[in-house]
Amino acid sequence: MRTVKRYFKHLVLFPSIIATLQILSFVKQVLTSFASFVIQRKEPHVVRTPEERFRGLEAVGYTFKPNYVDLPVGGGRTLPRVHYVDEGPREAKETMLCLHGEPSWSFLYRYMIPGLVKAGYRVIAPDFIGFGKSDKFTFPEAYSHDLHTQTLRLLLDHLGVSGVTLVCQDWGGLIGLSVVKDSPHFFSRLVIMNTGLPAGTEFSIYNITRIMPFLLWRSFAELLGTSMPVYLLFKTALLNPHPAVLDGYNAPFPSPLYKAGAARWPLLVPITSHTPVAVDMQDTRNFLSKEWKRPVLIMFSDRDPITQGQDKTFQKLLPQAITKTITRAGHFLQEDKGEELSAHIISFINNRL
């Protein structure tokens, strides 16, 4: 009986909180628009995080040489520069493509890369535009699902890779698996971690209640906008955060001007099934269930409230998948159990799982 009472208490409380946050977000937008009109502030369309922000990260394991390529995306006169880690031999027997999500960057994979390289693999870990060492558009509206998928396809073309094992987490899964659908010739295996393929939902009390925690996070993100406290977000999300590690995650964002991409991503997650992203996610689900017959490894952690239960969705879509539960790890499981994840991937490729 107490459980039922708590359920209905939350059912009433969450919409009230979300409505309040939506009102505050609207007020903020009005004030911001008015201030911009009065001040007539001109901001650059593309900014680049100063290199000194990344100094000292070798001390916490980010020791990789930077690689850059200018890609024709975004529709502006300035081509954004995309950063990627590229470690291991170019003629390696396998290539790993490691994709980060919100609001992280290739720094997230620093504990996984050495083990994979030592095993003889090539490891590529890009920073999506708006994150890490890649250039950043200063307006949230410049970011879209299509921007990120197009960027990834162009990067793969630039690198000339094939037979790739996709390693993806969070938004890296939404972007990466969409590209698998559209360009399957690049890929030979999938490693899916703490992500989902949200195709929106039809309105019902059950569905709205089920996604209420995400709606609360989305409303907070919309209210905070480019004031999102990345340092505090990781301090809350990581299980045992060290200040130097938190500095590493916060390094790409010296001011709100650099956070437009991080502010935008939560708002691109589809809530209803009729948005373009929702349609693409449903198409991706259909592709995986009907056409993807190659090997799959699913690794979800036991302490991630954000993607809890999504591993079951992938198991239904991909019945050939091997599934591993990573214990004592949160949403950013690469940070908590990076070396263990690498060991599982190596065993998976060598058919030892």
Q: Each predicted region: which residue ranges?
A:
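Short hydrophobic signal-anchor/transmembrane segments that target glycosyltransferases
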Residues: 115-117
